[in-house]
Amino acid sequence: MPEVSIVIVCMNRPDILFPCLDSIKAHTTVSYETLVVTYLFTPENLEALRTRYPWVTIVPSTELRGFSENNNLALRQVTGKFCLILNDDTLLSMPLIDSLVADIKSLPETAAAISPCIRFKDGRIQTCGRAPWTPRRYALHYLHLVDESKPNKWNMLSPSVFRTYTLNGACFLIKTEVFRAAGWFDERFFFTPEDIALGHKLNDMGYTVWADSSVSVTHLAGGSVSALEQAIKPARVRGSMIFYGEPLWLKRFIWCYEALRAFKYFFLPRKGRNEIMRKSALNVMKAVFSEETPKEIFKRFKP
């Protein structure tokens, strides 16, 4: 039995997946297995993965699925004592997995999961521990008033291991038996907040979540806005409404905010990013009061 089962979901992007796999190989000494969910891969890219990385277990995914569903395809096959959830657009530059395994073994039995410090390519901190996410915090986040890189009660409390509250799905290590007992990722969510929801559930189950600020992983997030944003954002918002219990005040707040955004983009040239953002705002307005699932929302607005 391997010590760690590494689970990576990749949407037909070998250009970012392969460097991630190379970095795992270069910086990991604990025993591990690697399961890659090949989401909508072309036959050519699938063959390239199989040829270049024969040590990877390929988990095909050929239907429309969100992050939770895709991860769960692989999670149901894991054999390791721990699971490492890792984005395909991440790079290891230190023995991250070894360190997290050593950390969690030294923590109390109630410790269920631990995250590293997650940094952007330029070195800025994305998250290093996460506070509880409440409807109020989500509203502030919507206004760009939440900065998870700033120290607070739950973030960066020490130069090493400290207790936090919830998780960032880009990278975290979790005890497999606890993850299984939690039901893996909640498949009601299509694009977020499955990671936050998992952290909250672990706390509700009586477990604790931790972070180690002394180890970090690079998250190559960001880039240009694609046309899929007009389907991804409303699905993401709908998932958040489900997680927060469908509060009417929050739905009204988001509707008004997106109405103002749509109004702004109405006066800008309707092309490129402007048009994507205008449609995104309009689609969120339609989705926020909907009773459809996030997956149904995504299907409805997918260009």
Language-model-derived ranges and their functions:
Residues 231-239, 245-303:
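Non-catalytic, C-terminal membrane-associated alpha-helical segments of glycosyltransferases
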Residues 19, 199, 205-229, 240:
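Active-site donor/metal-binding and catalytic loop motifs
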Residues 83:
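Short aromatic/hydrophobic "clamp" motif used to bind/position activated sugar donors
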Residues 165-216:
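A short, conserved alpha-helix in the catalytic core of glycosyltransferases
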Residues 90-103:
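Acidic donor-binding/catalytic loop of UDP-sugar-dependent glycosyltransferases
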Residues 22-31:
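Short, acidic, metal-binding catalytic loop of nucleotide-sugar glycosyltransferases
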